[in-house]
Amino acid sequence: MTNAKINSGDPHPRRRVAVLDTEMSYVDTGEGDPVVFLHGNPTSSYLWRNIIPYLSELGRCLAPDLVGMGQSGKSPASTYRFVDHARYLEAWFEAMNLTSNVTLVIHDWGSALGFHRATRYPKQIQAIAYMEAIAMPMRWEDFGEVEPIFRRLRSEKGEQMILEENFFVERILPGAILRKLSDQEMSAYRAPFLAREARLPTLVWPRQIPVEGEPADVTAIVESYGKAMSQSALPKLLVVGEPGAILRGRILESCRKWPNQSEVKVKGLHFLQEDSPHEIGAALQEFVKSVPQK
């Protein structure tokens, strides 16, 4: 299974739906209880292309592109804070009529959005699988060797790095994957951000990371859902990257205390789906089969 091919091509057609003042693009394949895949920065539903096939015979697999990302429309007001994405995503959940037995498969900022939703609508969620997640507010020491980069992104230098150099896509993304992405894969990740002004979401996201109490609103949200998850009996699957990037050290040890949780280790840095999609897919398949039906 480890030697299975990682496909550059994405076999899943995209649909579109109106949400608030824009449109969102999404994958919708399979039938049954919904399994919702949520990506983060600077990726899209393309991240899940090799994983969705493992679940599409077990349920209805949905993977949206967050607003301003992937093939989704932009925010007309250019508002891409966490609370803005949460608002758009809530409208998308309503449009999809996802009100019960939802399994969330979440990564990066998609994890924050997913945990937040699970905390607000616990009766709608059946299970959560998470990887390289934003599980608790961070300290600068948690960033390790990339601390200087993220400090710069949160300073006035961030505009040059992101808007002019497309830094998140060109440097951070490939630098957080063990293997070398193909030209086709890099083209897919670049596609939403070819224009300077289109890169704004990838600049706002690193400035939303809750570090040392800032921004205050995101810090409060992350603290709240972290506490909720630490007390929740919801079935959980923790996918640990080896060596991983953001979910390690004290944060990983804290997550390991969450109840009703199983754990699987896969090779990878931050974008585990690009290094170990088949291992993740197989683990998710087993996890979804094991979750008691409501």
Predicted feature locations:
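Histidine-centered active-site/metal-ligand motif
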Residues: 39, 107, 270
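A short acidic, amphipathic alpha-helical/loop segment
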Residues: 50-51, 250-253, 279
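Conserved HGGG/HGGXW glycine-rich cap/lid loop of the alpha/beta-hydrolase fold
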Residues: 27-71
